[in-house]
Regions:
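Conserved core of the sugar-phosphate nucleotidyltransferase
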Residues: 46, 59-135
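Generic beta-sheet signal
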Residues: 23, 52-53, 80-81
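Short beta-strand-to-loop acidic/aromatic patch adjacent to the donor-nucleotide binding site
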Residues: 43-56
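Residue-level signature of catalytic and energy-coupling elements of molecular machines
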Residues: 34, 54, 116
Length: 135
């Protein structure tokens, strides 16, 4: 990660890099911990972007990170996706096929995922415990 930190610093961007820690089993708790850290450092405002990434896909390019940040700034959130190559089958009752969506319109979400941190915090704070437990 050090090379990415130096790379973004040279571009004059204002990035806060906190301690990199092992995530919690629940994504929502991990993200809220990161947002709380940013807030405790006095760096949480309307323009703060949080980028989440998992260790399953350790090799992320500068281009993907830059695009995530740019689109999160513009649209409020950005998900890295790849086209689905397998057929996706929906089963609402877990026994019968309910729907087979058109593959050409399906994508698989990956990481990084990027968000306006304050907006994401507000969404999480308005979720029920049951909703948070499922995230």
């Amino acid at each position: 990660m050090k090379s990415l930190i130096v790379y973004f610093s040279r571009r004059g961007e204002n990035y806060v890099v906190g301690n990199i820690k092992e995530g919690n089993a629940k994504q929502a708790k991990t993200i809220m911990n990161a947002i709380s850290y940013i807030e405790s450092e006095g760096k949480l405002d309307e323009d703060t972007i949080i980028v989440t990434h998992d260790s399953v896909r350790p090799f992320v390019t500068h281009r993907i990170l830059e695009e995530n940040i740019r689109y999160a700034k513009e649209f409020g959130a950005c998900d890295t996706v790849i086209p689905a190559t397998d057929t996706i089958v929906e089963s609402k009752d877990h026994q019968n096929i309910s729907c087979i969506p058109e593959r050409s319109t399906m994508y698989l979400g990956q990481t990084p995922q990027s968000f306006k941190a304050k907006k994401l915090r507000d969404i999480y704070l308005n979720m029920t415990e049951e909703e948070l437990a499922s995230k």
